[in-house]
Amino acid sequence: MHQLFARRARRVTHGVCVGARACFATHAGSEARVHPSRMPRYAELLEQLSQVRPLVGGRPLTLSEKLLYTHLLDPAVDLAGAGADASKVRGARYLRLGIDRLAMQDASAQMALLQFMTCGMSQSAVPASVHCDHLIQAFEGAQADLERSLDTQREVFAFLESACRKYGIEFWRPGSGIIHQIVLENYAAPGLLMLGTDSHTPNASGLGCLAIGVGGADAVDALTATPWELLAPKVLGVHLHGKLSPWCSAKDVILHLAGELTVRGGTGYIVEYFGPGLQTLPATGLATMSNMGAEIGATTSAFPYTPAMGRYLGATGREAVARAAEQAARAGLLSADAGVEYDRVVDVDLSQLEPSLNGPFTPDLNVKLSDFVARARQADCPHPVELSGALIGSCTNSSYADMSRCADLAQQAQARGMKVQVPLDVTPGSERVRATMERDQIEAALTNAGARVLANACGPCIGQWKRADKQ
């Protein structure tokens, strides 16, 4: 596999030092001393799995159940009397879980840290990180916007940085990237149970863990190692087979599912993907699918370990994690058992999917691109006649793979004499992604097409931009 990321570049751009990971993560050393390893505890998880099996009557377990039950603080209590009847647990009883890792974004971390400071603890009980991405407004461009945000939000950033230093929490400075892309690149690993103070935290599940979005009070539970309670979700199985056409991406899978299931179709469920079609999808594509599971109300999503996950771990400097995960997968930890029963199953033939778009107003309004023009011309159509702007970015569309595809399209359009007709903004998911875009001339291809590169942050996706609607 080619070197996917530019990992050693170290320079000053956009007004801040970029490139090397530690340049942004100012307190990596402190966090590493308290929590010396980010390697999942596979031996312990496998041992607990062997203890769980008799408690559920030896019935086949879904991957979601394996990852949850191996994180139970007391399986004998939480699974008492369950036997082989899955309905006695799924959707029926609360699970008391131990959390492996916590991630917080700058807008929601403030109250969580203030509450944690009253607990009398000298450091966080689990590995944790804070990411400055939500409070950076997109007005002019990367450098000007970052400098403005550093000034207007200086008190917030100073508080977050000092609290992280005091309590051994890793702090990612403004400009380092979007929380979910950074977590995927650095922390997510197969088999982990993670929490994040953002609804799109399930993005990390694309690497085979269970990542769940929570509020500040739940974050304090994790920081203090208080048992985290979750009503055991039901499991919605999605069987993938076939192969996507060249114009489709993994995003079309979740857009299709949103149209089929609606915004409430996943409520109370973990969406668990299985089937041969999974082997054709990249890890960043799986992250996109799990990220947008939030749009159907899912608790999170689950994926069995695939070689694509191992390649991504290797490309981001985590070869040891990949090797350990492969061994855990062979031992049966990172996939569902044969003959497992789901509460509901949806079948998706990847070869039959078409490029599509969802919206406006609701993320379950799915329209195939081939039908879009005719649909837009209908009198009752909610789609606008003109576009106000375009964004290539957000936590679900800002990976290196996303950017390279868009750059290729931009170059094809330029070759045909086509020009951008509306404002086009680009927000790389992380400084690692942006540096690699620069190295591979992807950033140049997009800016030559008329795009404006913004800071590595949420920006327009969460309304942090100068919006000028068509009248």
Feature locations, PLM:
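N-terminal mitochondrial targeting presequence
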Residues: 1-32
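Fe-S-dependent hydro-lyases/dehydratases of central metabolism
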Residues: 25-471
